[in-house]
């Protein structure tokens, strides 16, 4: 197992961890149905940018 040669300061440790924070997912509201979905993804009803792109009945 690796052993550090010198102790890392709190500042160095925290600066390394500064990029570890999680960001909330960006959500969009579908303009025709009003549903919320991830950006650049099809809504649960199969609508993307106002157009029906997936026939929901065919999947089931």
UniProtKB/Swiss-Prot annotation:
Molecular function via GO: structural constituent of ribosome
Q: Keywords assigned by UniProt?
A: Ribonucleoprotein, Ribosomal protein
Q: Which InterPro entries match?
A: Ribosomal_bL32, Ribosomal_bL32_bact, Ribosomal_zn-bd
Q: Which domain of life is it from?
A: Bacteria
**What are the boundaries of the region Disordered?**
1-28
- Which biological processes are named by the entry's GO terms? translation
What SUPFAM superfamilies does the entry give? Answer: Zn-binding ribosomal proteins
- The annotated regions of Basic and acidic residues compositional bias extend over 11-22
Query: Any one cellular component term from GO for this entry?
Result: large ribosomal subunit
Q: Which family does the record assign? A: Belongs to the bacterial ribosomal protein bL32 family.
Protein name, please? Large ribosomal subunit protein bL32
| Organism (species) | Pseudomonas syringae pv. tomato (strain ATCC BAA-871 / DC3000)
Q: Which gene encodes it?
A: rpmF
């Amino acid at each position: 197992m690796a052993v550090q040669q010198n102790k890392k300061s709190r500042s160095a440790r925290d600066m390394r961890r500064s990029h570890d924070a999680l960001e909330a997912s960006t959500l969009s509201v579908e303009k025709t149905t009003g549903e919320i979905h991830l950006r650049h993804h099809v809504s649960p009803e199969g609508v993307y940018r106002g157009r029906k792109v997936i026939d929901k009945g065919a999947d089931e």
